[in-house]
Amino acid sequence: CAWLMAFACALAWASDDYKIKVEVVQKGNAFHTQASFYLPLTLCQSYRYLTDYDAATNIAGVVASTTTRIDARTARVERLIQERILFFPIKMRMVMEFTELPNLGTDFVQISGEAKYYKGAWRLESEGNGTVFKYRTESEPDSFLPKAVIEYFIKNRLNSSFETIAKMGAERVKQPC
């Protein structure tokens, strides 16, 4: 029983250790999202993780992710996402273009997909013995989804998605740069 308690406490501590923060503000039909988390990775390791676009298939709902290099600092990523939100089955396809800023982050914009628009950035900031990942987006979902469904997804899935992203990144602590 003591081992079970210790394990549960270790899991709770590990989750808090990422210092995950997520904030979503709706302005009209657009959603502005800001999120951040901390990982014990160097800037170089963090940048390599950030630009491993196809690792997203380990996040719940991301069924496929295919990356095509446009040039040395630009990547086009096509993703297929399937979710069940409340009782609604949702299938979305998007094509994103990422502009890479070595060891600083990425800028991205949806060039085709289900949202009216989706754009944002990841930024990396060295802090102590690790890196803070900062995410910000502006998006306007297509109106084919009921507003309540969109709000449910944003409020209930974003935290768990960022927690998964942080856990996957933390597993790369021993990978060379």
PLM regions: where:
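Short, surface-exposed charged micro-motifs
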Residues: E23, T66-T67, E97, K119-R123
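Extracytoplasmic/secreted envelope proteins and their assembly/folding machinery
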Residues: L43, Y47-Y53, A121, K155, ...
